[in-house]
């Protein structure tokens, strides 16, 4: 059984799992097979896996993908991965932090994503070009991503996720599928990039892709990239003549509130209607 195999790897390499650091290992072969299946991974795909741990998901991906790139923050797992998966020539192991490391180009993202980085990593994903994202995440987080305007869970994160992706929650993952058992309910969710339904939506996407710039500068670039303005001078003029509050323009994009983002979206729509 995969549980026994995992425990052997941990014991052999002297690894203690720390639940406070989201170090739960997926040990249910059926759930792993479903995760790989839902990801749509094929033999032409390069897959990026975040936080492989002892490599239980990694092994399943390696049997289907052209290449699997693993980014693991904790060095204690690297010897396990190298020993266990040494017979797979299509594996590339990277020691680094997925929130700060320059991420390699990939076709798909697959991960039992560490719970504490879910929101922060989603912000990184907004600037990535991939076919699909298939993650195991807390069920509460998945509900936020799918929440509609007016619902209690709806937030800035909901707006961003739905602007960039279509989502599907495939299945709940039983707590028995992990070692050790988590206190959080989890599920498998897939996100597929969404084509912009309007020029205004594309401009809003481009705004979010500006990272931590001040909104005024990010908005200027977004207007140009979305094709609303052809020059910086024109974009600056549009912003200067707008009714967007100075406080909003001076705020960094990552600090904008849901209300501010919705107001910016409404203003962008007036430019193209």
Indicate residue ranges for each PLM-predicted region.
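An accessory alpha-helical subdomain
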Residues: 185-193, 197-267
């Amino acid at each position: 059984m995969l549980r026994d195999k995992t425990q052997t790897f941990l014991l052999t390499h002297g690894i203690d799992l720390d639940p406070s650091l989201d170090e739960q290992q997926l040990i249910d072969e059926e759930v792993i097979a479903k995760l790989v299946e839902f990801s749509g991974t094929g033999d032409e795909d390069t897959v990026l896996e975040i936080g492989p741990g002892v490599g239980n998901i990694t092994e399943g991906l390696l049997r289907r993908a052209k290449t699997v790139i693993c980014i693991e923050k904790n060095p204690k797992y690297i010897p396990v991965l190298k020993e266990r998966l040494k017979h797979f020539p299509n594996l590339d192991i990277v020691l680094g932090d997925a929130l700060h490391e320059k991420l390699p180009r990939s076709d798909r993202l697959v991960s039992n994503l560490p719970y504490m980085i879910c929101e922060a990593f989603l912000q990184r994903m907004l600037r990535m070009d991939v076919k699909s994202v298939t993650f195991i995440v807390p069920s509460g987080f998945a509900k936020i991503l799918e929440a509609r305007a007016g619902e209690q869970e709806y937030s800035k994160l909901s707006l961003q996720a739905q602007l960039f992706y279509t989502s599907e929650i495939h299945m709940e993952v039983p707590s028995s599928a992990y070692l050790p058992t988590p206190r959080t309910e989890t599920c498998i969710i897939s996100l597929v990039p969404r084509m912009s339904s309007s020029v205004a939506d594309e401009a809003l996407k481009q705004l979010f892709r500006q990272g931590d710039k001040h909104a005024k500068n990010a908005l200027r670039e977004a207007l140009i990239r979305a094709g609303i303005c052809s020059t910086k001078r024109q974009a600056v003029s549009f912003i200067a003549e707008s009714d967007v509050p100075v406080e909003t323009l001076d705020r960094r994009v990552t600090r904008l509130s849901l209300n501010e983002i919705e107001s910016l979206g409404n203003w962008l729509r007036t430019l193209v209607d």
